[in-house]
Curated annotation (Swiss-Prot):
Organism for this UniProt entry: Salmonella paratyphi A (strain AKU_12601)
SUPFAM superfamilies to which the protein is assigned, alphabetical: Glucocorticoid receptor-like (DNA-binding domain) (SSF57716)
GO biological process annotation, one example: translation
Pfam families: Ribosomal_S14
The keyword RNA-binding is annotated on this UniProt entry: yes
Family the entry assigns: Belongs to the universal ribosomal protein uS14 family.
Name used for this protein in its record: Small ribosomal subunit protein uS14
């Protein structure tokens, strides 16, 4: 089980990314615009650097919804491999069955 502070930190990162999404997209558009002046592009880079570090979506980590485990996360279920296996063994995931060959 992950620490509550780690789960809270991840929730904070998601909120910051949502809050600054439009501003980051706007600045990145200016930076990648070849028609913009060098000064405008440089100012956009500087403004992008002043935004909070955690507002970048690449800082987010997928975590298991039940345990908060950051590794072995399966996006399809939103759970870690351990919890997916436990749920599958109890028959709680429709259409999922153990492989046998």
């Amino acid at each position: 089980m992950a620490k509550q502070s780690m789960k809270a930190r991840e929730v904070k990162r998601v909120a910051l990314a949502d809050k600054y999404f439009a501003k980051r997209a706007e600045l990145k558009a200016i930076i990648s615009d070849v028609d913009a002046t060098d000064e405008d592009r440089w100012n956009a880079v500087l403004k992008l650097q002043t935004l909070p570090r955690d507002s970048s979506p690449s800082r987010q980590r997928n975590r298991c919804r039940q345990t908060g485990r950051p590794h072995a996360f399966l996006r399809k279920f939103g759970l870690s491999r351990i919890k997916v296996r436990e749920a599958a063994m109890r028959g709680e995931i429709p259409g999922l069955k153990k492989a046998s060959w």
